[in-house]
């Protein structure tokens, strides 16, 4: 499994259930990296998507806190163990965690690749992920040129777990 996330300089990823900023280049990157794959998310992440609907062209796997939660067009799993079992049904590169912070932090070190958009600014955030640069078994294997949108600079990084 893998994960994709955008984080600011302090590894903040969200505030009040929303992204810190909307960068069309980052959203395009997310689409390119996830289309045709299984995307794993919590309920709040699902409900923050446009219209609160599953992402088209992907298998949407949702782990809600509420055991009675149902959502049309989604595969609902009830525990981390069930989530891991469901993810094992897909090729390793065919599963992408897309949020939120609880899932990222729980599963980050189980991921083969971390696709991280580093935003070169600090935002007021209330949701954070672990600092990928401090994870001992990961190294950067690719990084893009720096991008800029609406005066906000950012860069794409791919981290790989060393075997």
What are these regions (language model features)?
Residues 5-38, 43-78, 84-163:
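Flexible, gly/pro- and Lys/Arg-enriched active-site loops
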Residues 1-3:
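Extreme N-terminal starter segment of soluble prokaryotic enzymes
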């Amino acid at each position: 499994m893998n994960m994709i996330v955008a984080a600011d300089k302090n590894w903040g990823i969200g505030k009040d259930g929303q992204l810190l900023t909307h960068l069309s280049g980052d959203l395009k990157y997310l689409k390119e990296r996830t289309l045709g794959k299984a995307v794993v998310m919590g309920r709040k992440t699902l409900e923050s998507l446009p219209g609160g609907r599953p992402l088209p062209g992907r298998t949407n796997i949702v782990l809600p806190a509420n055991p009675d939660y149902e959502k049309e067009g989604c595969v609902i799993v009830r525990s981390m163990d069930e989530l891991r079992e469901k993810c094992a049904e897909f090729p390793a590169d065919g599963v992408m965690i897309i949020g939120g912070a609880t899932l990222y932090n729980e599963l980050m070190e189980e991921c083969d690749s971390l696709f991280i958009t580093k935003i070169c600014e600090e935002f007021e955030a209330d949701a954070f992920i672990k600092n990928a640069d401090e994870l001992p078994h990961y190294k950067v294997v690719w990084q893009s040129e720096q991008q800029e949108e609406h005066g906000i600079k950012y860069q794409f990084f791919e981290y790989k777990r060393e075997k």
